[in-house]
Curated annotation (Swiss-Prot):
UniProt protein name: Uncharacterized protein MTH_238
InterPro entries the record matches: Glu_synth_asu_C_sf
UniProt GO molecular function: oxidoreductase activity
Family: To M.jannaschii MJ0658.
Length: 306
């Protein structure tokens, strides 16, 4: 069905779309990582199937603070990197304000990966893993409301969290969800503690802060880490520390294969791991020992990869 533009009672401009079934990458600010495929997987100026709006029109509408209502189900990667001012598309590489995405049905996996601002409302079910988001108390009857972890920690909470504890400088998550990209683009001296496993790219593009996972992590943990500390109190899948730039990645277990691939800086401390050039194993420094002890870990169990 065709989409149309209208207004809600709060005077926010609204686009309504009713796609042909669950469509992936609606409101995806990366257009399914466009720089990797140059339009072969998703053309930003292609119409969303069954609607009169393109993927780009939806993203630009959200950048302007508007609302997008999906009349039906949504596919994978809804609102990916929402609020990221991506340098590849001419942005400054930081964070911008974003609008609202509302889904009248269910949402498939990886909703809100690397999301840094904006709000998502969902009437139906949401499949794990989810992204860098938590549920907060909803102000719309019949809808669940989700906000960015990074946004809350950097700009303050504007709603009561669900199964999440907030203390000064700390967020403790224990809601049973598996997450991708936890702590994405975090740039504040705060701590995130996540009880349970996480999946892809924990701490991606972090600059400051600490993310501590009380469980195992998936691939690409610490990818593009640019500062701060990521602590995994368990094992990681492969490619930990890929393209890492700065900071510490600490794995209290096995950091996996292809450790530190394309690493430009930073330090990986792990009990075990199989590095690839330019990363290699070396002795712990005094700074490494101090960091491990401050994290409550035993330095003699760890190896340095840098």
């Amino acid at each position: 069905m065709f989409g149309f533009l209208g207004r809600r009672r709060d005077e926010r401009e609204v686009i309504e779309i009713e796609p042909d079934g669950p469509v992936d990458c609606i409101a995806d600010f990366t257009y399914n990582f466009y720089w990797q495929h140059r339009g072969e997987k998703l053309d930003p100026d292609e119409r969303i199937p069954g609607t009169s709006h393109t993927f780009r029109e939806v993203v630009e509408h959200l950048k302007d603070g508007g609302e997008v209502i999906v009349r039906g189900d949504a596919g994978h990667r809804l609102a990916s990197s929402m609020g990221a001012d991506l340098a590849y598309f001419g942005g400054g590489g930081g964070v911008m304000d974003a609008g609202v995405v509302t889904v009248e049905g269910d949402v498939d996996t990886r909703m809100g990966i690397s999301m840094v601002s904006g709000t998502i409302y969902v009437k139906g079910a949401v499949r794990d893993p989810i992204g860098n988001i938590i549920e907060v108390r909803s102000d719309r009857r019949g809808y669940k409301k989700f906000m960015s972890v990074t946004d809350i920690l950097m700009n303050g909470l504007r709603a009561e969290p669900v199964n999440v504890t907030l203390e000064p400088g700390r967020m403790v998550i224990d809601d049973g969800h598996v997450r991708d990209t936890l702590g994405a683009r975090l740039d504040a001296d705060v701590e995130i503690i996540h009880h349970g496993n996480v999946d892809l790219s924990t701490g991606i593009l972090m600059r400051r802060g600490t993310v501590r996972v009380m469980g195992d992590a998936g691939k690409n943990t610490g990818a593009l880490l640019s500062g701060g500390t990521v602590i995994i109190q368990g094992d990681c899948d492969d490619f930990s520390g890929i393209d890492m730039r700065d900071g510490y990645l600490i794995v209290d277990g096995d950091a996996g294969k292809f450790l530190g691939a394309q690493r430009r800086g930073g330090v990986i401390l792990a009990r075990r791991g199989k590095p690839v050039p330019p990363t290699s194993e070396s002795d712990l420094t005094e700074d490494d020992r101090r960091v491990l002890m401050e994290a409550g870990l035993r330095p003699h169990l760890f190896r340095r990869f840098s």
